C-alpha cells in the first residue's frame, strides 16, 4: 500500500491515481536522496515550454509521473514540462502537474516538490484545464525535504501524510485544520523591490517598518525559491506569500503558472480558511487563457491577503503618497 486513503470516500479511480502519485513520489524521494552518487540530477538538459531551464530531475520526474498514470482514469496529462496536453487514454480525469517545483534548489539540498491538480475531464484536452480552479476535485503537493510529505485536499479539508522510509508508504497524519493567524512572517524575493508596482512596495515597506511603523509589530522575511516549501511552511506556521507581477520584460504576470502551481495551492489554502489572489482577484475564480498562463500570486492568512488587495484598491495618487511617505528602500 503506497498511501493510506481509508475513510476519505474516494472513488476507486481517484484512489488509484493518488496511489500512483504517492508511489512515484516515494521513488523520487529516494532518487533525490542519492543525488550525485550515480547521476547529477541538477544537470541542465534544455528548456521547457515556458522557456525555463530544465534540469535532469525535471525530465526524470515528468517521465515517471506520465508513465505511472498511463492506463489509469487520467485521460489528459498537462505538465509544465510539456508543450501541449498529452492524451493518455479515455478516462474521466484530467491531471495537471509541475513534476519538480523548485529545481534551482536541487544541487544545494533544499526542499523541492511536486504540485498536482485534478479536474473532471471534458471532451476537449485544453478545456479540461482552462477552467476555474474552484472546479478541481483534488489539489496537492509532495515535498521532498528532511521528511517526504504529501498534502492534498479533495474539497473537504486538507489531509497530510508522511513517507515512512521502512515501509515506503505514506502514513496519514492528523488533518491540517486551519492556518495559524497571528504569524509575523512573509515571503517575497526582496531583490526585485525596484521592479514592483507601488501597492506591493507600500505593503512591504509597512512590514519592514516593524514595531515603529503603521503595523506596530516586527516581521521576519522568508524566501526559499520553492513554492512547495513556502506553502508547507505557511500551512504549518501561517504568514503570507507574494510573487507579484513587475516591470521586467516577461514578468508583467509574474512567473508562476496558473494551472500547474497557483490553482492547486489556492485550492489547499482556501480549504483551511486562507486566501489566494493575484493581488486583487480570487485565483480560484479566474479563468486561465492558455495552458502555460502565468499569474501574480498572493496567498496565506486571509486577513493578510485581504490587506494586500486593499493596497491595490487605493487610488493611484493615494498609493503613491503612501509609498513616498513610508518607502524605506528609497535611496
Swiss-Prot record:
It comes from Rhodobacter capsulatus (strain ATCC BAA-309 / NBRC 16581 / SB1003). It is an enzyme of class 3 (hydrolase). Pfam families: FBPase, FBPase_C. Its main location: cytoplasm. Mg(2+) 2 binds at residues 98, 101, 261. PANTHER family: FRUCTOSE-1,6-BISPHOSPHATASE-RELATED, SEDOHEPTULOSE-1,7-BISPHOSPHATASE, CHLOROPLASTIC. GO terms for molecular function: fructose 1,6-bisphosphate 1-phosphatase activity; magnesium ion binding. Mg(2+) 1 binds at residues 80, 98, 100. Homotetramer. This is Fructose-1,6-bisphosphatase class 1. It is found in: Cytoplasm. One of its GO terms (cellular component) is cytosol. Substrate binds at residues 101-104, 189.
Amino acid at each position: 500500500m503506497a498511501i493510506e486513503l481509508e475513510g476519505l470516500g474516494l472513488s476507486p479511480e481517484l484512489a488509484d491515481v493518488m496511489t500512483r502519485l504517492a508511489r512515484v513520489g516515494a521513488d523520487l524521494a529516494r532518487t533525490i536522496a542519492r543525488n550525485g552518487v550515480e547521476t547529477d540530477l541538477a544537470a541542465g538538459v534544455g528548456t521547457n515550454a515556458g522557456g525555463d531551464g530544465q534540469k535532469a530531475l525535471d525530465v526524470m520526474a515528468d517521465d515517471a509521473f506520465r508513465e505511472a498514470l498511463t492506463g489509469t482514469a487520467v485521460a489528459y496529462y498537462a505538465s509544465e514540462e510539456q508543450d501541449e496536453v498529452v492524451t493518455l487514454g479515455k478516462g474521466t480525469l484530467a491531471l495537471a502537474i509541475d513534476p519538480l517545483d523548485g529545481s534551482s534548489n536541487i544541487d544545494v539540498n533544499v526542499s523541492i516538490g511536486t504540485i498536482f491538480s485534478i479536474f473532471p475531464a471534458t471532451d476537449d484536452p485544453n478545456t479540461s484545464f482552462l477552467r476555474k480552479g474552484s472546479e478541481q476535485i483534488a489539489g496537492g503537493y509532495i515535498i521532498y525535504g528532511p521528511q517526504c510529505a504529501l498534502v492534498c485536499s479533495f474539497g473537504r479539508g486538507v489531509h497530510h501524510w508522511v513517507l515512512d522510509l521502512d515501509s515506503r508508504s505514506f502514513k496519514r497524519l492528523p488533518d491540517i485544520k486551519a492556518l495559524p493567524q497571528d504569524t509575523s512572517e512573509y515571503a517575497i524575493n526582496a531583490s526585485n523591490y525596484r521592479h514592483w508596482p507601488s501597492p506591493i512596495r507600500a505593503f512591504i515597506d509597512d512590514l519592514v517598518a516593524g514595531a515603529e511603523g503603521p503595523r506596530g509589530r516586527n516581521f521576519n522575511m522568508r524566501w526559499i525559491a520553492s513554492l512547495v516549501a513556502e506553502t508547507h511552511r505557511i500551512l504549518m506556521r501561517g504568514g503570507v506569500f507574494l510573487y507579484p507581477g513587475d516591470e521586467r520584460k516577461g514578468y508583467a504576470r509574474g512567473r508562476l503558472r496558473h494551472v500547474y502551481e497557483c490553482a492547486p495551492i489556492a485550492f489547499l489554502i482556501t480549504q483551511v480558511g486562507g486566501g489566494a489572489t493575484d493581488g486583487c482577484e480570487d485565483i480560484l475564480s479566474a479563468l486561465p487563457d492558455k495552458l502555460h498562463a502565468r499569474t501574480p500570486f498572493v496567498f496565506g492568512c486571509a486577513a493578510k491577503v485581504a490587506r494586500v488587495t486593499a493596497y491595490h484598491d487605493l487610488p493611484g495618487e493615494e498609493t503613491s503618497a503612501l509609498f513616498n511617505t513610508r518607502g524605506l528602500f528609497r535611496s
